[in-house]
Amino acid sequence: VSRFDKRKNHEKVLMALRNLKQIYPDIVYICIGYGEEENNIKELVKELDLSGQVMFFKDISDDLKNALLAKSNIFVMPSIVHKTSVEGFGIAFIEAAQYSVASIGGKDGGASDAIQHDKTGMICDGNSLEDIYSSLESMIKNKRYLELGKNAKALSLKFNWSNTIEEYKKILTKI
């Protein structure tokens, strides 16, 4: 669930997926979004022979997006710094966590605000194909994503409007 741009790092995820499909032939990567890199990413899917593993959705309802998240095991967005663009707070990771979906995020940007490494997901070096691959493989192996997803769900509960309002009130009373 993200825009298709260089910062989101779909290319490296696809390269890791190419290797993972040898071990896990039923693996599927669901892409929800649009953006300037969409055609390049679709072309890379063909080049890497991943058409059977990658599904694309865009302009879908919130209900369908939420249903796809709920059926997912892992949310992966190992963002990188691209030019001067850095990932902000990882709201997409929190959305996934609400459905007990563990996440893999990049060490650059806001993923670490939403993911507790080795507790609710994994933080990896998005510039390293090996790190992305090993993070995915580690979660898939022995279905580790189930435990991390359960923890992610618990963490996501603190990111609701009531808690956010209370945090703002605390800040404002200090001013």
Please report, for each region that a protein language model flagged, where it lies by residue.
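A structural motif in glycosyltransferase catalytic domains
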Residues: 13-16, 29, 132, 168
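A short, well-ordered alpha-helix in the C-terminal region of glycosyltransferases
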Residues: 26, 131, 144-158, 167-170
